[in-house]
Amino acid sequence: MLDVNFFDELRIGLASAEDIRNWSYGEVKKPETINYRTLKPEKDGLFCEKIFGPTRDWECYCGKYKRVRFKGIICERCGVEVTRAKVRRERMGHIELAAPVTHIWYFKGVPSRLGYLLDLAPKDLEKIIYFAAYVIVGVDEELRHNELSTLEAEMQVEKKTVADQRDADLEARAQKLEADIAELEAEGAKSDVRRKVKDGGEREMRQLRDRAQRELDRLDEIWTTFTKLSVKQLIVDELLYRELVDRYGEYFTGAMGAESIQKLMESFDIDAEAENLRETIRSGKGQKKLRALKRLKVVAAFQANQNSPMGMVLNAVPVIPPELRPMVQLDGGRFATSDLNDLYRRVINRNNRLKRLIDLGAPEIIVNNEKRMLQESVDALFDNGRRGRPVTGPGNRPLKSLSDLLKGKQGRFRQNLLGKRVDYSGRSVIVVGPQLKLHQCGLPKLMALELFKPFVMKRLVDLNHAQNIKSAKRMVERQRAQVWDVLEEVIAEHPVLLNRAPTLHRLGIQAFEPQLVEGKAIQLHPLVCEAFNADFDGDQMAVHLPLSAEAQAEARILMLSSNNILSPASGRPLAMPRLDMVTGLYHLTRLDEGATGELAASTNEESEQGVYSSPAEAQMAVDRGALVVQAKIKVRLTQQRPPRDIEAELFPEGWNYGDGWTAETTLGRVLFNELLPADYPFVNEQMPKKRQATIINDLAERYPMIVVAQTVDKLKDAGFYWATRSGVTVSISDVLVPPEKAQIMESFEAQADQIEKKYQRGALNKTERNSALVKIWSEATDEVGKAMEAHFPDDNPIPMIVKSGAAGNMTQVRSLAGMKGLVTNPKGEFIPRPIKSSFKEGLTVLEYFINTHGARKGLADTALRTADSGYLTRRLVDVSQDVIVREVDCGTERGIVTTIAEKQADGSMIRDAHVETSTYARTLAADAVDENGNVIVERGHDLGDPAIDALLEAGITQVKVRSVLTCTTGTGVCATCYGRSMATGKLVDIGEAVGIVAAQSIGEPGTQLTMRTFHQGGVAGDDITGGLPRVQELFEARVPKGKAPIADVSGRVQLEDGDRFYKITIVPDDGGEEVVYDKLSKRQRLRVFKHDDGTERLLADGDHVEVGQQLMEGAADPHEVLRVMGPRQVQIHLVNEVQEVYRSQGVSIHDKHIEVIVRQMLRRVTIIDSGATEFLPGSLTERADFEAANRRVVAEGGEPAAGRPVLMGITKASLATDSWLSAASFQETTRVLTDAAINCRSDKLIGLKENVIIGKLIPAGTGINRYRNIQVQPTEEARAAAYAVPSYDDQYYSPDGFGRNTGAAVPLDDYGFSNDYR
C-alpha cells in the first residue's frame, strides 16, 4: 500500500485503454455474480475469484490449497492466487468493449470538451455518438480533384439518361392520351367523360415530370455534396449517405458512433490546431475570438501535458474491486446488491450481444442499434441520468452510478474522506457539574472503563493482577474490584476531548481532565456551556480519547478548557459567570440602605456602629446575626489592593501586601474582592454582568491564563452559593401590572380615535393612517414600560434578574407586566392595532391570533436560518482553508489606516465605538506620533488595551496598522500582518490556521442574524436586504438588490428631477467628460450628505461629490467600487458592510477575520493581454503566479502580461482553487474532476482539505514542516550529565536533597516558592 508520507503531490489525468488493461487483473466476460446454490462467485463473472482474489484468506476457489503456507501460489486447477481476501478491495478488472464508446463526462459536461476539441456543436456530436448521423472522417482530396472532370462527365451522362427517359415517357403518354380522346370522340362520349380522361392523362404526365425532376435534384444534391465533402461534415440523410458510398466510396470514408470520433481524434493535429487558434485570437474579433479562446483552453491543455485525447473514447471499461460494490445475502435467501453491479451487468450483457451480432455478420442497422445501447449503458454506469432518462432499479429509483458515489454530502469525498467515524469515542447526555474545576469534566465510570479498556488491561498485566491480556480482558468485562483502582490510576492526567454538535467554532471541542462519576451522564463545567452553546435540557455530548503522547500533549496545551477562556472571534472572555452566577454575585455586591448593622455615626446613647477592624470580624458579626452582607460598613483591609486613586493618595510609593487602609463598602463587596487576585485594585460597586465582564477582560489582559481560570472558578462557586441565598424565584405574583396603565391607555386611545376619524373623513390615506397609528402606539408602549419599571420595588426578583444581566430584558418583562405593544405581520410590517393586554392580564382572542402570526414567522425563520448559516460557514471554510500563518514578518511597509477616536469641536476626544474590533490586537505599521512629533508607540508594537489608552491620552485619532489585506506573503499570511491571536492574546503562532478560525468566527454567529428584509417605516417597495442574506450577498460578491450608483469622478452634481426617475450628471473637476446616471428610480431615496458646515441634508443640485461616494440610498455594487476605487477600497468596503450587519445584531467579530476572507476573494487577476507570458487572454490566474511570471518575462526582456484584479464570490473562489481535491470535495464534483483530468492537474497538497482527504497530517499547527522536522540535540554539558557515574558522596543517593527522610510533609515555604498568585 502507498504510504501517504512519501509523496507530496497527486496528479489526475485521462486513462488510456492501455492504462486500464494494466490496472486490471483479468477480463470480466460474464454478467453472472454469485451462484445462488453454492454462494460462490461465478468464474469470469463480476465477482470472479480468479480476477479479484480469493473470498477467504489463504484459500483458493476449489479448495486444493488452504493455509498460509501456500502463500503466493496460483492454483493450477481454478487459477486463483492464494492470498489475503482483502485484495478484493484493491484489485480491478476490465471489460473489453466490442465497439468503442465515448466517456459521457467529456461529451456531455458543460462545456463539452469533446465538442471544443473537434470543433463540433454538442447537438451534432450527440447525433454522431448515438447513431443518428454519419460523419465524414476522411476525404481523399487529391484523388477527387484529379478525377473530378471524369466524374462530372459521368454525372452529366446519367442526368442526360434520366432526362431522355423522361422525355420518351412523356412522349409515349401524350400519344396514348391523344389516341384515347380520339377513340372517345369516335364513340360520341359525353364531354365530361372526355374531360376526365384528359385530366387523368395530364395528371400522370405531371407525375412523370415530378418524378424525373426529383431524380435530377437527387443527382444534383449527391454531386454538390460530393464536390463539397469535407472532414467533420455531418450527413443526417441515410439514403444520401448510401448513394454517396455506392458512387464515390473510394474517395472518402464516413462512420457513425464513437468509432468515428476515435478516427477523427487519430487524425487530429493538436499543435497545428493550437497555432491556428492563437492566430485567430491575435487577429479575430467578437464571437469568433471568444470561441477560439474557449477552444484554446481545451486544446492547450492537451498540448501542454502528455494526456492523449484518445482517453475520451474508451475501448475498455475498468471494473472496480468487488468489495467496493458488495453483494450480501439477506434472511430469506434474497440478495441485496450495490447498484453498480446492475449497471455493470447491463454493460456486459450488451457487449456480449454485440460481439455475437458482429460474429454472425448481422445487418448494419441491428449492429448500430446494439452499439448505441452499449454506449447508453456505459453512460449510465459513469453518470446515470446525465443524458436522457436515468436507468431505474426496482421501485422506479434511479440507480447510483460511479459519479453519484463521489457527489454530494453522502458521496465518497464528504462522507468517507472528510468526515470519518472514530474509535475510542462515546456519547451521553450531559448534566451540570458545579463542583468541578474549569479544566475537569465528570466521566461515567462505565464509559471511562470502555474508553480506557486497552490501557486498563495493560496496567492489570503490569501489576500482575492478570497473567495475560486475555484474562485482563475478562477481568475488565466482569468489572472486578481491582479494575476500578487501576482505572483511577490510568485516567489520571489523561485528557479527553468533549464535543457538542453542531461544532460551529473551534471551542465546540475542548479538552478536560476526566473525573470518575457514578451514573451514566457526563458532567460538564457550567462555565464552558457558553462556548459549547450547551444547556442541560437533554443535550448530548461526545467524548474522544487522544491516544498518542503527542496528541495528549496537544490536547493539554492547546485545547484544555482553561486555556480557551477567550473567544477566537473577538478576543473577549467566553468562560464567565452567567445566569444564576450573575444573579448571585449581583446580590452579593448589592448595597441596601437601612440594612441590619449598617454604618452609623456615634450618638450620645450609642457608640459608632458598623466599623470593623478586619473582614473576619465583620464575618463574625454576620454569623451572630448582627450584620447582613449588603449593609454599608467601614472596614480595615490589608490583603486587598486599594483602588488606583486611593493608592496614589495613601501609598505614593505603591501598595505592598499587608499595608492597611479603610474602605466604606459592604461585606459582600469585600468577599467579592477576595475572589480576585490580591494585587487587583479593590472594586467598590455593584456587579451586574457587564461589570463582571470588564473585570474578567481586564484580568485576561494583565494576568496569566491560569490566574484567570482560577478566578472565574472562584466566581462560579461564589455565584452559585449566593444565588442560593438570595432566594430569587419567579412567581406569577411577582409580575406587577402598573396601576397607571389604564390612564395611559385612555389618553392614547383618544389620540388613535382622532386619527381614525381623520381617515374616515378622507383627510389621511391608508399608509399615513398606519404610520400615524404605529407612532402613537409605540409611544404608548414606551410609556407603559416606563411606568412598569418605576412601579417595581427594588427587591422584586423579576427586575433583579434583568438588571443583573442574568437573563431577559425589559421588553420581555413589559410583555409580562405592561403591554405587548405592536407586532409585525409576516411581511415584517407593523400591524397598526397593538396588543394592549399583558400576559398577566391575559390576551383577547384577536390579540392572541395576531401575536401568533409573528411568533410562527419567527420559528420558520429560525429553521431556515440554521441551514443557510451552516452552508455559509461551509463556503467560508472552503475559501479560506489554506490561509495559514507561514512566516513571522513579510516585511511590508504597507497597512491600512484605522480611526481610534474623533476630535470634537471643543477639543475633547470621543473614543471610536469600534476600536475593539478594528484597531485592537493589531501591529502598528508606522510610528504613532502626537502633534509635537513625539513617538508614543513605535512601529511593530502590538496594540493591546494599554497601548490604545496611551494613544488616546496623547490625542492621536488615527493610526496605520498592519493588515492581512496588505500582507505580501505568497500563500497564507505572516504573523505580524495578522497581529495577535484573539484566543491567546499573544502574537499568532506560525502554523495557526487563521483562515479556518476566521470562517468559524463569521459563520458561528450566523444563526443569530435575522433573515428578514426590513421595511422602511412601513413602506412597501424596495427593501433593504439585511441580516444573513446581506452577508451572503457580500461574500458572494453579487450585485445587490436595489444597488446604488457611486460617483465615477469627483465633481459637481446636476440633478434633474423627472416624474418617475432622477437623472444625475457629474461635471468632473478636472474638466473631463461628463458622467451621466440615467433612469434612477424614485423608489430609492437620494443619499444624505454631510456638508462642510456640519449640517446633513439630501444630495441636491450643485453639491460637490468625491470619487466613489454613493449618490442614492441602498447598497453599492462591490464590482463598481473595485472598478472606480481599486482593490484596496473594495476590500475595506466589504469589511465595513459585513460588520454593519453583525454590529446591528450586537455580535462582536474582529475585522481581521473578515479581512482574511475578503483577501481570498481578490486573489485572482483576469488576463487582458498575455504579452510574452504563457497566460491565455481572459483566463483567471493567481496574483502571485501572475506577478512571478511578469518578473521572469521582464528579466528576459519580454513584454509583461496586463491583467486587472477581479472580485470573486466565495463559492467561485473555492472552485477556482489550485487544488483539485479541495475543489472536488466542495461542490460540482464531476465538473471539477473532468476539468482537472483534461488539464492533467497536479495537487501540491498545500491546503488542509487535500491532506485530510489523503490522510496526511494537516500542514497547520504542529503538522507544519518546520515543527515536524525538529530534532533535539543535547549540549555538551547535558551529554556529560547524562553519562556521569554518580559517586556515593555527592548526595546522589542520599535523600537530604529535598526534605527530611522521615516521611513527614515537606514545608514548601522553606524552598522559596513564589507566593504572587496564592
Swiss-Prot record:
It catalyses: RNA(n) + a ribonucleoside 5'-triphosphate = RNA(n+1) + diphosphate. Mg(2+) binds at residues 535, 537, 539. Its cofactor is Mg(2+); Zn(2+). GO terms for molecular function: DNA binding; DNA-directed RNA polymerase activity; magnesium ion binding; zinc ion binding. GO terms for biological process: DNA-templated transcription. Keywords: DNA-directed RNA polymerase, Magnesium, Metal-binding, Nucleotidyltransferase, Transcription, Transferase, Zinc. CDD domains: RNAP_beta'_C, RNAP_beta'_N. PANTHER family: DNA-DIRECTED RNA POLYMERASE, DNA-DIRECTED RNA POLYMERASE SUBUNIT BETA. This is DNA-directed RNA polymerase subunit beta'. It comes from Rhodococcus opacus (strain B4). The gene is rpoC.
